[in-house]
C-alpha cells in the first residue's frame, strides 16, 4: 500500500526569531506560541507531535501529547530527570501510542557500520568501553548570575520558562546556554551521553546499568 503523505500541520515556538525560518519553510502550517492552546484547539487536526524544546519542559508536553493519544517523537534527553522518564514510560504503555526518542548519534552511518562489524565477528570479546565527551561548550557549575538582562522582544519568557521556577532573564541564555543550568538543562552529561554512550548500549544490548560511580570538582 502507498505511504500516506506526511504533512506539517502546525508549528509552535515561543521565540519568533527561531520560528521564522520554520514558518518560511512550511507556510501552510498553522502557528502558535503556546503549545497548550495548540493542543486545546487543534488536537483533532494532527496525529503526532515532535518535541524539540529545552529539557525542563519535555515531560509535560510529552505526557500531554500521549494523553491526547498522539504519537510522540521526543528529542533527547528524554526528560529532565529519571522520575519524569518513568512517568512517560508508564504513559506510553497506558495509551498505546508510538514513541521514539530523537538521538541522531544512534542513527548515523557509524552506528550501522559498527553493527555490521560486530555481527560479522570482526569485533569480539568486548569487556570494556571507554567514552569521552567534547562538551561543555557553555558555562556550567557556576552560580546563577546576579546581573540580569532584558528579554528580547521576540521571546515570550513566561512561556519559555514553562514548568520552571519564575526567574529573571540572563544574557545569552537562549537559544543554547540554558543547558548549563540545572533548572532548565542537564549539562554536558544529559546533552551528550545518549550520543556518546548510547551506541555501546544499543550495540551490546547492555540494558539498564547495575552500578554507577561518579566524581566532580568544585
List each model region and its residues.
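Residues embedded in well-ordered beta-strands within globular domains across many folds
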Residues: 10-12, 50, 127-130, 161, ...
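A structural signal for well-ordered alpha-helical segments within the folded catalytic domains
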Residues: 59, 63, 86, 108-112, ...
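Rossmann-like dinucleotide-binding domain that binds NAD(P)(H)
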Residues: 157-218
Amino acid at each position: 500500500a502507498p505511504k500516506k503523505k506526511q504533512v506539517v500541520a502546525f508549528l509552535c515556538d515561543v521565540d519568533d526569531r527561531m520560528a521564522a525560518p520554520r514558518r518560511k519553510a512550511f507556510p501552510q502550517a498553522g502557528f502558535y506560541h503556546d503549545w497548550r492552546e495548540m493542543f486545546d484547539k487543534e488536537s483533532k487536526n494532527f496525529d503526532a507531535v515532535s518535541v524539540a524544546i529545552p529539557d525542563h519542559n519535555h515531560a509535560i508536553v510529552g505526557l500531554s501529547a500521549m494523553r491526547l493519544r498522539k504519537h510522540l517523537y521526543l528529542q533527547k534527553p528524554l526528560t529532565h530527570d529519571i522520575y519524569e522518564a518513568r512517568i512517560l514510560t508508564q504513559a506510553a504503555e497506558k495509551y498505546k501510542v508510538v514513541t521514539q526518542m530523537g538521538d541522531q548519534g544512534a542513527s548515523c552511518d557509524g552506528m550501522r557500520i559498527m553493527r555490521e562489524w560486530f555481527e560479522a565477528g570482526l569485533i569480539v570479546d568486548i569487556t570494556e568501553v571507554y567514552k569521552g565527551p567534547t562538551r561543555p561548550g557553555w558555562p556550567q557549575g557556576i552560580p546563577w548570575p546576579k546581573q540580569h538582562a532584558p528579554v528580547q522582544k521576540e521571546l515570550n519568557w513566561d512561556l519559555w520558562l514553562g514548568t520552571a521556577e519564575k526567574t529573571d532573564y540572563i544574557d545569552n541564555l537562549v537559544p543554547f546556554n540554558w543547558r548549563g543550568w540545572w533548572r532548565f538543562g542537564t549539562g554536558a552529561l544529559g546533552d551528550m551521553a545518549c550520543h556518546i554512550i548510547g551506541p555501546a548500549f544499543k550495540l551490546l544490548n547492555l540494558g539498564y546499568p547495575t552500578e554507577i560511580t561518579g566524581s566532580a570538582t568544585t
